[in-house]
UniProtKB/Swiss-Prot annotation:
GO terms for biological process: cell division; cell wall organization; peptidoglycan biosynthetic process; regulation of cell shape. This is Phospho-N-acetylmuramoyl-pentapeptide-transferase. It comes from the Bacteria. It catalyses: UDP-N-acetyl-alpha-D-muramoyl-L-alanyl-gamma-D-glutamyl-meso-2,6-diaminopimeloyl-D-alanyl-D-alanine + di-trans,octa-cis-undecaprenyl phosphate = di-trans,octa-cis-undecaprenyl diphospho-N-acetyl-alpha-D-muramoyl-L-alanyl-D-glutamyl-meso-2,6-diaminopimeloyl-D-alanyl-D-alanine + UMP. Its main location: membrane. Keywords: Cell cycle, Cell division, Cell inner membrane, Cell membrane, Cell shape, Cell wall biogenesis/degradation, Magnesium, Membrane, Metal-binding, Peptidoglycan synthesis, Transferase, Transmembrane, Transmembrane helix. It is found in: Cell inner membrane. Its EC number is 2.7.8.13.
Length: 361
């Protein structure tokens, strides 16, 4: 909205031409989302407390988590509000890719909201049954991928580029939608599994989103993409602003989600933000780079898969003390803040490795 207004004023006031630049609007978008999060956070927390929407704690989990019972959750609504407001203000709303990414994010947030609502308000301990959650995630992903694949306004490259190798590519052809589907749904669920400690998931989300914003910026520019050896994907520059909005909204949420947390994001936040990372990576054709930068999410997911598989194969034995992996380290005696910060450090390394693929080819 404000971007459209500045476009009208450019003819009379040359100073407004600065709003043409993605970098400038990205900064404003991030600051806007941050301010919305910081200002609305206390109101959201009080509102959730008034509704008695508090976190339920696993009885078989670390004993230190018992004190978290009753902490307001569904705070992901605040994150999505900040992202949406920021994008509506500073993005060029004529870009189809922006609406695709934003709608996928909000749709997955709706699935998470229903799950949280059933668990916390209706007191249904199972929430939204897993098969239905996966069904609706799949529907959203398939609709998005189909639109991306067949819509002429979003030219899709079916080539999968290998990170660190300039000339190694695989043309997926009709299998592109399959890969894209698994990236979106897998990313959504991986972030959901990681969101188990105060601030553990949101900071890696912020870091990965910021890095994806760099890729979106480079991919939307023919000169930069050719120089860096990455796919050129036109009409995707506004995704830089979308990613910047995630950064700002995430930092605003972290203000209240840092240890000891005043609010949790819930499935409404984790499913939405995970899907956001996935769909952005698909649109800018950086699926394998997302696998690198989101290495923490991958490790957490693999720990659950290995734990379940080993438990069934061994007849009841466990590979880890508890899954996901962050609980394993808690039960080994690590304090919660130590687990969180060390996992953040791991994410910094993964994100730097992902960014290194821009130049090391």
């Amino acid at each position: 909205m404000l971007y459209w207004l500045t476009q009208l004023l450019q003819g009379q006031y040359h100073a407004f031409r600065v709003f043409q630049y993605l970098t400038f609007r990205s900064i404003l978008a991030s600051l806007t989302a941050l301010i919305v999060g910081l200002l609305c956070g206390p109101l959201m927390i009080r509102w959730l407390r008034g509704l008695q929407i508090g976190q339920m704690v696993r009885s078989d989990g670390p004993q230190t988590h018992l004190s978290k019972a009753g902490t307001p959750t569904m705070g992901g609504v605040l994150i999505l509000l900040a992202i949406t407001v920021s994008c509506l203000l500073w993005c060029d709303l004529r870009q189809t890719s922006l609406w695709l990414v934003l709608l996928v994010t909000l749709a997955n947030g709706l699935v998470g909201w229903v799950d949280d609502y059933r668990k916390l308000v209706l007191k249904n301990s199972k929430g939204l049954p897993g098969r239905w959650k996966y069904f609706w995630q799949s529907v959203i992903a398939l609709v998005a991928v189909s639109y991306l694949y067949w819509n002429a306004s979003l030219p899709v490259h079916t080539q999968l580029t290998a990170p660190f190798f300039k000339t190694v590519t695989w043309d997926l052809g009709i299998f592109f939608p399959v890969l894209a589907y698994f990236v979106i749904v897998g990313s959504s669920n991986a972030v959901n599994l990681t969101d188990g400690l105060d601030g553990l998931a949101i900071m890696p989300i912020v870091m990965v989103a910021g890095a994806l914003g760099v890729f979106a910026y480079a991919s939307s520019n023919a000169v930069y993409s050719n120089y860096l050896g990455i796919p050129y994907v036109p009409n995707t520059g506004e995704l830089t602003i979308f990613c910047s909005s995630i950064v700002g909204a995430g930092l605003g949420f972290l203000w209240y989600n840092s240890y000891p947390a005043q609010v949790f994001m819930g499935d409404v936040g984790s499913l939405a933000l995970g899907a956001a990372l996935g769909i952005v990576a698909v649109v800018v054709r950086q699926e394998l780079v997302l696998l690198i930068m989101g290495g923490l999410f991958v490790i957490e997911t693999l720990s659950v898969i290995l734990q379940v598989g080993y438990f069934k194969y061994s007849g009841g034995k466990r590979l880890f003390r508890m899954a996901p992996l962050h609980h394993h380290f808690e039960l080994k005696g690590w304090s919660e803040p130590k687990v969180i910060v060390r996992f953040w450090i791991i994410t910094v390394v993964f994100v730097l490795c992902g960014l290194a693929t821009l130049k090391l080819r």
